[in-house]
A protein has these predicted regions:
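Residue patterns forming the tRNA-binding/recognition surfaces of aminoacyl-tRNA synthetases
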Residues: 1-43, 63, 99-106, 112, ...
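Conserved phosphate-binding loops in nucleotide/dinucleotide-binding enzymes
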Residues: 133-136, 175, 322-326, 347-357, ...
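Protease-associated
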Residues: 47, 54-130, 139-143
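Catalytic cores of enzymes that engage adenine nucleotides and/or redox cofactors via long glycine-rich
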Residues: 253-258, 263-275, 306-314, 322-331, ...
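Secondary-structure transition/capping motifs at alpha-helix termini
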Residues: 146-155, 183-193, 265, 316-322, ...
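Active-site-adjacent "gating/activation" loops or surface patches in catalytic cores
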Residues: 109-117, 323-352, 383
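Glycine-rich (often Gly-Gly/Gly-Pro-rich) flexible segments and glycine-rich loop motifs
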Residues: 274-320
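Alpha-helical support elements that line or immediately flank enzyme active sites
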Residues: 139-144, 368-377
Length: 401
């Protein structure tokens, strides 16, 4: 669990838009209210996400001795006003959530707008029913923003500080910027409440510290290109599964899997030997030959060869390109053993008679082996897959580690 700064804050919105969808004349300043436990993500806000099946009310309140109109999900009015410390309000109108779609509110402190979009992840469990959405700071935010054609704005560097072009907070470590952001909202008159909130939050398994969600460019294998996923799913039926339930397990995991992110940012591992253009980000047109060159070097000198080789040793237009420093996903490494073990040993045969591992490998080795083999050879790398259990100690903990 983590104790976070939770805030209710508001986005100004044009009276004309609200008068039209609520069908009522308005006199006070108008706002849409949102709630978050991550104020540091506000520099990345580009949207407000509603649930298009909810009912939203426009209510009049008096806050800080001023009257204002705010939009809230009908089912969350009471809990929101309790956080703000207000007991009295007047309902000015109600409307379905879908009527807000496409409208724009003004960012709480930046000179830009926030598009109102819809997402199924918006619930009435907490908050206001309107989710502040930063495409670069969370999987749900990223997905719903991509669906609506929004830029993936990720204004945070790899060291956890804001980019140099972030107004007000450039260079600040993001978690330490919470106080500054809350103070700025207060100065702009758009902060309604602030409190401590204890909740479950992802932590690094190794360091036990809270993680920071940050969208970064990565390399993917497309599941739809050349029907890779469809072919992989169709191949499952021709494999023998022991126990038999392994077939349904693999089938269901494949049916819901996204594109495969194969890049990792680590100091160890098999490098992704790509050169990309400094301006366009496109890979070099002679990538196949470059990879062959690098592979030959690695066979002679080891993995370090990629880091040591100069770009000018590989291509003539070296000044236009830069090396990728990412490493391959380890599941890609292990997943191609059918090629780098079976194919190069005359005493072995392809496909393998048997792959065997624990049940967690339907998502790991079994799956990565199947996908890479279908991509490379159009056939499964194994005839039979055996899933075994785990030996555990007296407390039920597995002993494999």
């Amino acid at each position: 669990d983590k104790v976070s700064t939770s805030i209710d804050f508001i986005f100004p919105i044009a009276a004309d838009d609200l008068e039209r969808i609520f069908n009522t004349p308005l006199e006070n300043p108008n706002f849409i209210a949102s709630w978050t436990t991550t104020p540091w993500t506000l520099p990345g806000n580009l949207a407000l996400t509603i649930n298009d099946e909810f009912i939203y009310d426009l209510i009049e309140i008096e806050f800080d001795k001023k009257k204002m109109n705010i939009v809230l999900a009908k089912d969350l009015i009471e809990s929101t006003l309790e956080r703000i410390g207000i007991s009295e309000y007047k309902t000015l109108g109600s409307c379905e959530g879908h009527k807000f779609l496409g409208l724009k509110a003004k960012h709480p402190y930046l000179d830009r707008s926030s598009l109102i979009i819809a997402g199924d992840h918006v619930t009435t469990e907490a908050g206001t029913g309107i989710v502040h959405t930063a495409p670069g700071h969370g999987l749900e935010d990223y997905a719903v923003s991509k669906e609506n054609g929004l830029e993936v704005l990720s204004p945070v560097k790899a060291n956890g500080t804001f980019n140099d072009d972030v107004d007000h907070f450039a260079g600040l470590f993001v978690f330490k910027a919470n106080e500054n952001i809350v103070e700025l909202l207060k100065e702009n008159g758009v902060l309604l409440s602030e409190s401590s909130y204890e909740h479950s939050y992802p932590h690094c398994w190794r360091h036990r510290t809270p993680v920071m969600f940050r969208a970064t460019p990565q390399w993917f294998i497309s599941m739809s290109s050349k029907d890779l996923l469809e072919k992989s799913i169709n191949s499952v039926d021709g494999i023998r599964w022991e126990p038999a339930w392994g077939e349904a397990r693999m089938q269901s995991m494949l049916e819901t899997r996204p594109d495969w992110c194969i890049s990792r940012q680590r100091s160890w591992g098999v490098p992704i030997a790509l050169l990309v253009h400094n301006e366009t980000g496109e890979i070099h047109p002679h990538t196949q030959q470059i990879i062959e060159q690098v592979a030959t070097l690695v066979e002679k000198k080891g993995i370090q060869a990629w880091h040591d080789v100069e770009i000018s040793d590989l291509i003539d237009d070296a000044e236009d390109y830069e090396k990728i420093t990412d490493c391959l996903d380890v599941w890609f490494d292990s997943g191609v053993t059918h090629a780098c073990v079976l194919d190069v040993n005359e005493d072995l045969q392809f496909p393998a008679d048997l792959y065997l591992e624990g049940s967690d490998q339907h998502r790991g080795w079994f799956q990565s082996s199947l996908l890479t083999s279908i991509a490379m050879k159009d056939v499964s790398p194994y005839k039979t897959v055996l899933t075994h259990g785990f030996v555990v100690d007296s407390e039920g903990k597995k002993m494999s580690k």
